[in-house]
């Protein structure tokens, strides 16, 4: 029995070591200012909580040993029921910790708000007045990532790059289900949701190649929904952009509709140009121009609805599911309604940009 137990223990230790060998300390030692502040917040909060946890555990073990049944020297007071000093310590110390945690939470919730533009690129280094954030539009698909650079006019699949020490302004949406964008070295997790737009302001402070992933289960290909994030110098980023323009194709609405079909382990793709208005159509869920946009539906609802007559505006649309089977679903055809109800950024070639 004993040799078997020893062998089992060794096997468990080796298995645990093998499993943990792939772990990385990037979460606690990131290379982006926002992620560094979040790591500091984790450490501060943990230390504050340990101020209560450690003494409680230590006193529990001490009391259990000191007042054990076999210790006849310990004070025995079966009628004791109150101590003002103990009450103050028991209730006062946790209350002070909770107040401290609450204050830290309130301050950092506003300071690290992902929608809040950056006021610094690192500790003691404010954002220069002449530096404009890099705009990046990100779309979580089944099961890949699409990144659109509106200022550069390019797009990539499963590859992201940004200059070091330049603020990045991300806008996120999704094609089908809720997902989560996460680059541990850059910043915390941000949800992506279909028909909605979330944001993140971040900065990378050290050149390198970092892992990015989907941090939320979203179907069969979820585990392969990964990409590489490149932190580059300004010159390297300019060359990277030029490389996409030279070797890439054009990302049109028709190309996007093919790209959004479910697929896993998608290789890196590069697009030299992006059709104007594509991002707005993605968020508004009407890349297929035969379908009604979300903003149009909201305008109809705001006006009281279309009643039974609205059924005449429906149509059947083809769709390929995760297993590759061709199916059909009912969608609403387009109607004439006010534009840009979602407050989307103005893109070249769109009505919002022309107004």
What are these regions (language model features)?
Residues 2-56:
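Hydrophobic alpha-helical segments
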Residues 18, 59-62, 104:
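Transmembrane alpha-helix boundary/anchor motif
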Residues 24-42, 67-355:
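Non-transmembrane, membrane-proximal soluble domains of secreted or membrane proteins
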Residues 55-70:
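Membrane-water interface of transmembrane alpha-helices
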């Amino acid at each position: 029995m004993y040799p078997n137990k020893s062998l089992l223990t060794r096997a468990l230790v080796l298995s645990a070591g093998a499993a943990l060998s792939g772990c990385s300390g990037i979460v606690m030692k990131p290379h982006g200012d926002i992620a560094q502040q979040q790591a500091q917040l984790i450490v501060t909060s943990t230390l504050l909580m340990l101020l209560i946890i450690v003494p409680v555990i230590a006193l529990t073990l001490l009391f259990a040993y000191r007042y054990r049944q076999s210790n006849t020297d310990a004070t025995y007071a079966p009628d004791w029921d109150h101590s003002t000093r103990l009450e103050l310590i028991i209730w006062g110390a946790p209350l002070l910790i909770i107040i401290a945690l609450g204050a830290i939470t309130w301050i950092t919730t506003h300071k690290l708000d992902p929608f809040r533009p950056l006021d610094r690129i690192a500790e003691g280094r404010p954002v220069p007045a002449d530096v404009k954030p890099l705009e990046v539009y990100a779309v979580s698909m089944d099961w890949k990532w699409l990144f659109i650079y509106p200022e550069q006019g390019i797009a990539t699949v499963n590859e992201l790059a940004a200059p070091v020490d330049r603020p990045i302004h991300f806008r996120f949406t999704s094609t089908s289900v809720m997902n989560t964008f996460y680059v541990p070295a850059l910043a915390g997790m941000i949800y992506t949701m279909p028909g909605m737009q979330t944001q993140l302001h971040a900065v990378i402070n050290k050149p390198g190649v970092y892992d990015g992933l989907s941090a939320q289960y979203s179907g069969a290909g979820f585990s392969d929904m990964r990409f590489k994030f490149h932190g580059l110098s300004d010159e390297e980023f300019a060359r990277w952009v030029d490389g996409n323009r030279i070797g890439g194709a054009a990302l049109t609405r028709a190309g996007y509709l093919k790209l959004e079909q479910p697929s896993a382990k998608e290789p890196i793709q590069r697009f030299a140009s992006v059709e104007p208005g594509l991002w707005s159509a993605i968020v508004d869920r009407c890349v297929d121009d035969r379908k009604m946009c979300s903003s149009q539906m909201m305008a109809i609802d705001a006006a009281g609805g279309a009643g039974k007559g609205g059924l005449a505006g429906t149509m059947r649309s083809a769709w390929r599911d995760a297993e590759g089977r061709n199916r059909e679903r009912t969608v609403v055809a387009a109607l004439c309604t006010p534009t840009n109800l979602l407050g989307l950024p103005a893109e070249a070639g769109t009505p919002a940009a022309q107004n």
